[in-house]
C-alpha cells in the first residue's frame, strides 16, 4: 500500500471515528427508563385510570341503587341535629366501630339491582292543622312512601325520650291516634304504659306500634299522626316531643324492621395483589372509598369502606359478566379486542344513611365490593 493510500485511510478513520463512536455510545448508554420500567409505568397509569373510574362509578351506582337522582343536601351540622341519641341507632354505630370496614364472609343478596332495606328510622314531623287545636299538638306525624308499603312489616317500635323527673315517680306513657277536629273526639288512645322512673334520670322508652302501623299502611287516609304524653304524679309531661335547647336528637322516632328477600352466603376467594405487586395476570387490587372525600355527609356509616378493583392481563376470550368491564376497556382501549379483567364476584355493604325526606335508613347496597376478579 502506498504511503498516500495509508494516509488517506487513516484520515477516513479519524473522520469517521467520532461518528461511529458517538453512534455506539448512543446505543450503549443506559436509558433513563428501561423497557421494564416503561411497561411498569404504563401499568401503573392504567391502574390509576381504573381506580378513578371505579370511584366515579361507585358514586353513580350508590345513587342509582338508592333510587336517588342526586345526593341529599344534608350538611354535617344538620346531621348532628337530626341524628337521634337513641339505643337502636347507637347499637348500629357500635357495630361499625367493632367491624370497621372488614369485608370478610359478607352476605350476598339475590337482588343485584336495588337496595334491600332492613331497618328504617323515621323522624316525627308536625301534624296537619286539621288535627290541631290552638297549634297543638306539635307532634307527631310519620309519613310512608309507596315503596315502604310494599314491604312486609316485621316489627315497629316507637321510641320516646323521657325527661328526668324531680323525684322518683310513676309515669303514665300514653299514645293516642289523632283525628280531624271536625270529627268530634280527635283522640283515640291506642297504647298506655305504666313506667316507674328514678329521680333525675332520663330514659328512652319503646312502644310496640306494629298494629297501628299496619292499619295506616292499609288505610293511609286514617294516618293523621299520634299524640304522645308521659305524665308524672304531679301532672308534668316528661315526654320530649319537640326539641328544647339541649334536646337535639331526643325527639320521638319510629324504628321499623321489614322483611328481606332470599339471600345466600358467598365466600371470598381469588387472586389478590397490592399496588407494588409485579403480577401481570388479572388480579384484585385494594381500593378504599372515603365518603367524606365525596362530601357525602348524609351517609352516617360507614364513613369509608374497601371497594377493591380489578386490573391485569387476560389470555382467553370470555363473555362479559358485569357492566364494570367497560371501565377497563376505556382505560386500555388496545385490549378491547380480547378478554377483560373484571369482577366475577361482588358483595353488598351495609349502610346507614339519610334519605331526601331526612329519614334514617339502614340497609344493604348490593354489588359494591369486588370479592374476586377474572377474565370475561
UniProtKB/Swiss-Prot annotation:
Localization, UniProt: Secreted
CDD domains registered for this protein in UniProt: TGF_beta_GDF8 (cd19388)
Propeptide: 23-267
Protein name (Swiss-Prot/TrEMBL): Growth/differentiation factor 8
Superkingdom per UniProt: Eukaryota
Induction or repression: (Microbial infection) Myostatin concentrations are decreased in serum of fish infected with nodavirus as compared to serum from uninfected fish (at protein level).
Residue stretches spanning the membrane: none
Description of how the protein assembles with itself and partners: Homodimer; disulfide-linked.
GO molecular function annotations of the record: cytokine activity; growth factor activity; protein homodimerization activity
N-terminal signal peptide: 1-22
